């Protein structure tokens, strides 16, 4: 029986009692539909977050960048101690730094419109929010930073565009005014 390009292979793993109880609890509570989907999800996260490069515990790398698990409350403290008139500029610098990381890690140009879905998938995997493009608009659902000025600057620095903010509460909508250099 073929699945994809290869055929399925049965694998047996032996779990400690505590591990099996944890998995059974997840399934019982409806958090996971079964063992196979759970393992598939774990492998997807392992690959996409490059966990094989982590120096566990406490030192995590995803490509060329060190990443941390940080409470949104701590990010909000940082944000709200930056003068509001600097938010767009700070966001732009964050976007430029993310552009370097994404281009080096994924091997794609973040300013290439055809690669934006890959860029947005990476941001979603890392917890930035859910990003959508429709015509000349970019929308962010569930952003981890609640200030559209920062996001406008971030996307401008990352994608090489100029944006107008259309909504000031999440989900954020930005209109693409001008693409600076979005060619492959």
Residue ranges and their predicted role:
Residues 167-184:
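C-terminal edge-of-domain segments
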Residues 117-172:
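Short, hydrophobic/π-rich interface segment
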Residues 22, 33-59:
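Short, basic amphipathic alpha-helical segments that act as recognition/interaction helices
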Residues 73-77, 82-139:
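An N-terminal amphipathic alpha-helical segment
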């Amino acid at each position: 029986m073929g699945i994809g390009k290869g055929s399925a292979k049965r694998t047996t793993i032996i779990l400690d009692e505590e591990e099996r109880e944890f998995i059974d609890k997840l399934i019982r509570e409806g958090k996971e539909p079964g063992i196979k989907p759970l393992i598939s999800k774990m492998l997807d996260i392992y690959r996409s977050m490059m966990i094989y490069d982590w120096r566990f515990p406490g030192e995590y790398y995803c490509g060329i960048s060190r990443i941390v698990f940080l409470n949104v409350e701590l990010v909000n403290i940082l944000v709200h101690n930056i003068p509001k008139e600097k938010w767009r500029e700070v966001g732009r610098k964050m976007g430029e730094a993310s552009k370097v990381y994404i281009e080096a890690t994924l091997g794609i140009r973040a300013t290439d419109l055809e690669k934006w879905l890959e860029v947005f998938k990476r941001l979603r995997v890392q917890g930035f929010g859910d990003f959508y493009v429709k015509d000349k608009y970019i929308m962010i659902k569930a952003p981890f930073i609640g200030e559209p000025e920062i996001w406008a600057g971030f996307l401008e620095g990352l994608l090489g565009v100029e944006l107008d903010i259309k909504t000031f509460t999440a989900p954020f909508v930005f209109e693409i005014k001008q693409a600076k250099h979005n060619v492959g």
